[in-house]
A protein has these predicted regions:
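Bacterial N-terminal signal peptides
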Residues: 1-5
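Lipid interaction determinants
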Residues: 6-154
Length: 154
């Protein structure tokens, strides 16, 4: 795409890249329980650099409770506060065919950061909108993949 100034000079825009700061705005779940979840009230942030990514999100439909004293909280109270919180960081690789494979290094859930663990998504970048659709992980293809719609924050 070229940008033409009033004096006739043209400048080339920066190449399209998934690198940046993103916010999930929607999750579309397929399969028997298909539905779309709006993320407008779900705090989240995904940061993608040249080789690494980091994501945090709250997967709850409303605000999480605030505990007066964490040391005195019951197991159910702790689950209500920390259960919906997701965090993960790792490396990623882009491949032909619009695929991105993510390999977690650190995560709230230790099961997703072991040796050989990965998840591959197809991705589509349309301006400042990034769509990620699950394809497969170390166990094989997803029977009912979900798709995430993210918008660029910066």
């Amino acid at each position: 795409m070229a940008l033409v100034t009033g004096q006739g000079a043209a400048a080339q825009s920066a190449p399209r890249s998934i690198q940046g700061v993103w916010k999930i705005v929607e999750a579309a779940i397929s399969g028997p329980a298909a539905r779309t979840i709006a993320f407008t009230e779900r705090p989240n942030l995904t940061i993608i650099t040249n080789k690494h990514y980091s994501r945090v999100e709250v997967q709850a439909d409303g605000p999480r409770p605030i505990l007066a004293d964490v040391a005195k909280a019951t197991a159910d109270e702790l689950r209500a506060v920390w259960g919906p919180f997701v965090s993960e960081a790792g490396t990623y690789e882009l491949a032909a065919g619009g695929l991105i494979t993510m390999r977690p290094i650190a995560a709230k859930n230790p099961a997703v950061m072991g040796p050989g663990v990965f998840i591959t998504y197809s991705y589509k970048l349309d301006g400042d909108t990034l769509t990620l659709t699950q394809q497969r992980n170390q166990n094989g293809p997803f029977a009912n993949p979900f798709a995430l719609k993210l918008v660029r924050v910066e």
